[in-house]
Amino acid sequence: LEDRRLVELFNRYGIRGTFNLNGGLPRPERIPESEWVELYKGHEVACHTYHHPTISRSPLDQTARQVLADRMQLEGVMGYPVRGLAYPNGSWTPEIAALLPALGIRYARVVGDTHDFAMPHDFMTWKATCHHTHNLLEDGKRFVELYKTQYLYMMYVWGHSFEFRTEEDWALMEQFCQLAGGREDTWYATNIEIVDYMADAARLQYTAAGDKVCNPNAQSIWVEVDGRHYEIPAGKTVALV
């Protein structure tokens, strides 16, 4: 139920979120499905398995069933393909990670903090920068002070809205949103938007001379050349001069 307050806070400061839901758990203390579409508008709904089992101890075929059942339940409500996952209880194995693409999953978040801002090397074992109770403001201050444009920086905060037990917890998150939100130099994106954008960026087609680039994708991609920024619109070829 705390998702309602958290989404309102995110919306106020322009923060985007990904919300991992279990389609098969009882709902007396959970937000009813009838509210999902409106509540999570502008954010992403992603999988967390159907019943939240410890999947590293489950048969692989039953893990597949958990993921697909959750996808189908969430997609039936949200009306779009659900392509992300947070491992339940942080439980995973290399075999599970290798299985997920065949189940339509493009990324999966593990438990733990990096306290770093680098892009992940493997989106199937995506570790966040920090939990919302672990150096949130300290990491946030370091993030907004970054300035080297030759790197791709990302700050990713994970956690659970039910862990906000006191007004002090909510005040801390609002401080972070005030610090990090509404910045013109920051793209506020959901998990799947980041994954899709990076995949599309990798598909850009450059001339051998490096003076033109074609974008075969369905969204604009931005590149920087010699300090100048170029928007490469979908389906267009742009001269980099």
Regions found by a protein language model. Give the residues of each.
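A Trp-anchored, charged/polar loop motif used as the substrate-binding/catalytic surface
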Residues: 131-146
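Generic hydrophobic alpha-helical segments
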Residues: 6, 70, 140-144
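C-terminal domain-boundary segment and adjacent tail
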Residues: 12, 27, 75, 107-116, ...
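Short coil/turn linker and secondary-structure boundary residues
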Residues: 31, 58, 135-138, 168, ...
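Metal-dependent polysaccharide deacetylase catalytic core of the NodB/CE4 family, i.e.
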Residues: 13-106, 112-130, 153-161
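Non-membrane alpha-helical structural segments and their capping/turn regions in soluble enzymes
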Residues: 60-65, 137, 167-170, 174
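Short acidic, Gly/Ser-rich segments with clustered Asp/Glu that frequently serve as metal-coordination loops
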Residues: 1-5
